[in-house]
């Protein structure tokens, strides 16, 4: 579960390394974000000499959380870290590579481009 002020790792090659969530996109009362939700975040750490700069406001989709996620068949999946991928306004990833596994639940949120870039789909 991701809420405001939560730090996340970026697992693509867009140029950012860490972001901090500042808003969960959706209903005005929505406090927590889960896998597949879009957040608005600020870049806290970036790779030097890239197009992403620190303190830049970006949109990101959550692909892994430390809080376990339960599927409809009862299987629970948990990750070691909170991870996200930076996207543009249309929902396309800004990076061209994705590091680490992603969950197949992203398919129902129409993030098929992220799934095709991922090396492993759980």
From Swiss-Prot:
Pfam family, one: Ribosomal_L14
Keyword terms, alphabetized: Chloroplast, Plastid, Ribonucleoprotein, Ribosomal protein, RNA-binding, rRNA-binding
GO molecular function: large ribosomal subunit rRNA binding; structural constituent of ribosome
Origin: domain of life: Eukaryota
Cellular localization per UniProt: Plastid, Chloroplast
InterPro entries in the cross-refs: Ribosomal_uL14 (IPR000218), Ribosomal_uL14_bac-type (IPR005745), Ribosomal_uL14_sf (IPR036853)
GO CC annotation, single: chloroplast
GO terms of biological process kind: translation
Keyword Metal-binding belongs to the record: no
Primary site of residence: plastid
Family matches, as PANTHER family: 50S/60S RIBOSOMAL PROTEIN L14/L23, LARGE RIBOSOMAL SUBUNIT PROTEIN UL14M
Family, as annotated: Belongs to the universal ribosomal protein uL14 family.
Function summary: Binds to 23S rRNA.
Subunit structure: Part of the 50S ribosomal subunit.
Designated name of the protein: Large ribosomal subunit protein uL14c
